[in-house]
Structure formats: structure tokens, C-alpha cells
């Protein structure tokens, strides 16, 4: 049975058969639910805690 993965950037669950797997040079695997998450992490180096649409969002006092 296929397993659901969790997006490495936003934290949302990825249904089986969708998403993108990115493998770094050191062998770690990153799973992304959309190109928005992939670009935010790899291209723009954004912090997921600062964006409300992620599950890792934390309000800063």
C-alpha cells in the first residue's frame, strides 16, 4: 500500500502519486507538494515559519 509523505517545506500531506522528490548531493531526500514549496525552499531559501500558508507557521511576538 502506498504511503503518504509530508512536504519538507509546508508540512502538508502529499497524496500517493503526486508531489516531487528532490535528492541532495549528500543523499537526503526532500519531498515537495508543489513547485511553490520547492522554489521557496531551494531557490529563495525562505523560512517556513514566516508564512501563514504553512503548517509550521509561528507568530512572532
UniProtKB/Swiss-Prot annotation:
Zn(2+) binds at residues 7, 10, 33, 37. Signal peptide: none annotated. GO terms for cellular component: ribonucleoprotein complex; ribosome. One of its GO terms (biological process) is translation. One of its GO terms (molecular function) is structural constituent of ribosome. The keyword Metal-binding applies. Its cofactor is Zn(2+). Keywords: Metal-binding, Ribonucleoprotein, Ribosomal protein, RNA-binding, rRNA-binding, Zinc, Zinc-finger. Gene3D superfamilies: Ribosomal protein L24e (2.30.170.20). InterPro entries: L24e/L24_sf, Ribosomal_eL24, Ribosomal_eL24-rel_arc, Ribosomal_eL24-rel_N, Ribosomal_eL24_CS, TRASH_dom. A zinc finger (C4-type) spans 7-37. Binds 1 zinc ion per subunit. It comes from the Archaea. Pfam families: Ribosomal_L24e (PF01246). Binds to the 23S rRNA. Part of the 50S ribosomal subunit. Forms a cluster with proteins L3 and L14. Belongs to the eukaryotic ribosomal protein eL24 family. This is Large ribosomal subunit protein eL24. It comes from Saccharolobus islandicus (strain M.14.25 / Kamchatka #1) (Sulfolobus islandicus).
